[in-house]
Amino acid sequence: AKGVKYPLADFNITPDIAIVDPDLVKGLPAKQVAYTGMDALTHAIEAYVSTLHGPFTDPLALQAIEMVLDYLPASYHGNMDAREQMHYAQCLAGMAFSNALLGIVHSMAHKTGAAFSTGHITHGCANAMYLPYVIRYNAKDATAASRYADIARRMGLAGVSEAALINSLCAKIDEMNTELAIPKTLQEFGIKEDEFKEKIASISELAVGDACTGSNPRAITPAEMERLFNCIYYGTEVDF
């Protein structure tokens, strides 16, 4: 085993019909409710800012974002009506990203998920940790910044300027991670510092080459990816 996750996509493995039955997730443990819910939020946000977004994917992505923000906390705390709505939200997010594709949050989650001896970083947990840092990185691109601000504005978050709206969006994600008991940094998750330093250069190379990187709204080099991972490990500001 290489310790590397590879995303696979092909029409030969695409189902003709999806049965979206909320009864299937009634018994889901709270931790998995949190991780899969934040994965759905990441799917929707990345689809909305993707270079391949369009008029067919934008409404699906925005509706999914709104539903996750509205229903995930209650679903996490055991409300079955909210869990049903989350089940629909993840489907809408899936429809959005299946057509608009994703970005480097997923690239990074794919390539760190099985990389460390500490244990597997569950995909949704990784996405939740990485998302606010990637928003900060991508928001240095004017088009991406406008899209993130649009999300915040439509979700009724505070702010007038784009910068203030983006701050509110990141703060909302941080707030949700706190409520869902998701770590804010890789260090807090428990990744050992010496192993992180040893592996992060090669992980960064792999992440840049991931299939999801091509539709990210801002280009990234292996050196920039390594800097971004360092911000996520130590919880430092993304200022580049």
Regions of interest found by a model, annotated:
Residues 115-118, 124-198, 238-239:
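Gly/Pro-rich interdomain helix-loop hinge
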Residues 1-100:
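Carboxylate- and glycine-rich phosphate/diphosphate-binding segment that chelates Mg2+/Mn2+
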Residues 41-45, 86-94, 108, 131, ...:
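Short alpha-helical scaffolding segments that buttress acidic/His motifs in well-ordered protein cores
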Residues 195-240:
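Short, amphipathic C-terminal "tail helix"
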Residues 81, 164, 187-190, 215-223:
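Short coil/turn segments at secondary-structure boundaries
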Residues 61, 83-86, 148, 166, ...:
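Hydrophobic packing residues in well-ordered alpha-helices of helical domains and bundles
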Residues 91-127, 210-215:
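Glycine-rich phosphate/pyrophosphate-binding beta-alpha loops
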